[in-house]
Amino acid sequence: MSETRAVLRGVRLSVDKGRLVADLIRGKKVDQALNILTFTQKKAAVIVKKVLESAIANAEHNDGADIDELKVKTIYVEQGTTLKRFTARAKGRGNRISKPTCHVYVTVGN
């Protein structure tokens, strides 16, 4: 009952958008999860797929796990730091632009 993790920190993605994709694959077998992510047309799907592939590679290389039996045990997306930017407006004013980041955590196991 081994578990292997992969983490991606500081991704330029909003937490809510990342969680929508994470909810799609939680608890599924990894081949089914990769299939879902391949055909999900969201930016977050590409990011989560890379982290999931990394977790699968870690499980195979470090733990010698059989890929066919792996499942997505846990996947969660947490809020990271928010990058604060500035854009010029009329009459010498300025507005703040928030560019949110998040951290993606994936654990696979059998």
UniProtKB/Swiss-Prot annotation:
InterPro entries: Ribosomal_uL22, Ribosomal_uL22_bac/chlpt-type, Ribosomal_uL22_bac/org-type, Ribosomal_uL22_CS, Ribosomal_uL22_sf. Transmembrane segments: none annotated. GO terms for biological process: translation. Keywords: Ribonucleoprotein, Ribosomal protein, RNA-binding, rRNA-binding. It comes from the Bacteria. GO terms for cellular component: cytosolic large ribosomal subunit. Part of the 50S ribosomal subunit. HAMAP family: Ribosomal_uL22_B (MF_01331_B). Belongs to the universal ribosomal protein uL22 family. This is Large ribosomal subunit protein uL22. It comes from Paracidovorax citrulli (strain AAC00-1) (Acidovorax citrulli).
